[in-house]
Amino acid sequence: MKILFVAAEGAPFSKTGGLGDVIGALPKSLVKAGHEVAVILPYYDMVEAKFGNQIEDVLHFEVSVGWRRQYCGIKKTVLNGVTFYFIDNQYYFFRGHVYGDFDDGERFAFFQLAAIEAMERIAFIPDLLHVHDYHTAMIPFLLKEKYRWIQAYEDIETVLTIHNLEFQGQFSEGMLGDLFGVGFERYADGTLRWNNCLNWMKAGILYANRVSTVSPSYAHEIMTSQFGCNLDQILKMESGKVSGIVNGIDADLYNPQTDALLDYHFNQEDLSGKAKNKAKLQERVGLPVRADVPLVGIVSRLTRQKGFDVVVESLHHILQEDVQIVLLGTGDPAFEGAFSWFAQIYPDKLSANITFDVKLAQEIYAACDLFLMPSRFEPCGLSQMMAMRYGTLPLVHEVGGLRDTVCAFNPIEGSGTGFSFDNLSPYWLNWTFQTALDLYRNHPDIWRNLQKQAMESDFSWDTACKSYLDLYHSLVN
């Protein structure tokens, strides 16, 4: 099968979050499964700086962005058997960052038009075209409405993956004519209109042949008013083509037996290296080196969406216990300040690292006993899977991908891969935390069994790839 991905970011070239991880990993697994895969990404200045000498020029042409004729260069490289094509236009993409400009609508309108028009020129007409989030969600609409006259594109099947429904691409309806060069018929009849705006995500949901999300629970949640971000009724209407597939993690990169960022390696049969990493981490962050105290890790953006309003409200109570917490992250200044203040009050119990450090993050995943992740909503989440890979048990709010990946501790059977609570409140966070502390202190054999189950969980991309192939084969025979 010929499969083409079009996305706004993709590791290792450009990455701001989970979308970049998916584009970096899923195509590689599909190639291993015997498929021909290509990816189209914007050619950002950070790509030029880091990978420019590995990327070759292929061709160039002009794209009509409404009344404008814009330069479009095509560049190319091959990595892990995947062919990466880059759309080059320095005016749109040499901004020093991926998102956040006033003209993001124009930037990604150009990108989508260029990606579609590039397919014939690079001689890669896919059986299946997979687009991601709002930045590329107009492509299924454009294929069926603007480019339907191109015979080579007639049989292309499309999949839209929603990584985060909060970001929908809502713009003025004038963009249809001014940038995309199409009429207003589909806006006037309500197809593309939402809250009196042009909504790119709605267009993708309605026009894509299939819609996927990054976990089965999130697929159900976005059809409710609580999580649907005002598109729940549209998603319910299209529910027959909506499904959820849990993202994977790179099992080779996140491997406690070979991880180059760790001082000591270990496996599920021998955790002595994990204990040594714990002592090393305690020393590094200025906490007393104690093997007996439970060490809790947090690696996250410090935002309300990640549940840190509830964590801060619970922190004084939690720190009354004989426990240590090491935090790594940045975000809302109020939460940054709160953690810094608590770290001054409880210097032997809390280390607040208001920054981001890849090595320290990896050490936290590997060395801690518990990993705290009480997100208010979480489409998939990767940190809990990384933590489990290293035998660090997640304590999570039972929502979205956290519900699908963390098997809650069952005290009757003594089974599970972590701890979870259903109601996001200080009471239930504290109650679940106490359950975990009791198990750690008084039932080490059960704790050890949970660690083993967590480390044996299969979150590899090769496994996730099989689910995506099932989805693709439902469209392409």
UniProtKB/Swiss-Prot annotation:
<keyword id="KW-0320">Glycogen biosynthesis</keyword>
<dbReference type="Pfam" id="PF08323">
    <property type="entry name" value="Glyco_transf_5"/>
</dbReference>
<dbReference type="InterPro" id="IPR013534">
    <property type="entry name" value="Starch_synth_cat_dom"/>
</dbReference>
<keyword id="KW-0808">Transferase</keyword>
<comment type="function">
    <text>Synthesizes alpha-1,4-glucan chains using ADP-glucose.</text>
</comment>
<dbReference type="Pfam" id="PF00534">
    <property type="entry name" value="Glycos_transf_1"/>
</dbReference>
<dbReference type="GO" id="GO:0005978">
    <property type="term" value="P:glycogen biosynthetic process"/>
</dbReference>
<keyword id="KW-0328">Glycosyltransferase</keyword>
<dbReference type="InterPro" id="IPR001296">
    <property type="entry name" value="Glyco_trans_1"/>
</dbReference>
<dbReference type="InterPro" id="IPR011835">
    <property type="entry name" value="GS/SS"/>
</dbReference>
<dbReference type="GO" id="GO:0009011">
    <property type="term" value="F:alpha-1,4-glucan glucosyltransferase (ADP-glucose donor) activity"/>
</dbReference>
<protein>
    <recommendedName>
        <fullName>Glycogen synthase</fullName>
        <ecNumber>2.4.1.21</ecNumber>
    </recommendedName>
</protein>
<dbReference type="GO" id="GO:0004373">
    <property type="term" value="F:alpha-1,4-glucan glucosyltransferase (UDP-glucose donor) activity"/>
</dbReference>
<feature type="binding site">
    <location>
        <position position="15"/>
    </location>
    <ligand>
        <name>ADP-alpha-D-glucose</name>
    </ligand>
</feature>
<comment type="pathway">
    <text>Glycan biosynthesis; glycogen biosynthesis.</text>
</comment>
<comment type="similarity">
    <text>Belongs to the glycosyltransferase 1 family. Bacterial/plant glycogen synthase subfamily.</text>
</comment>
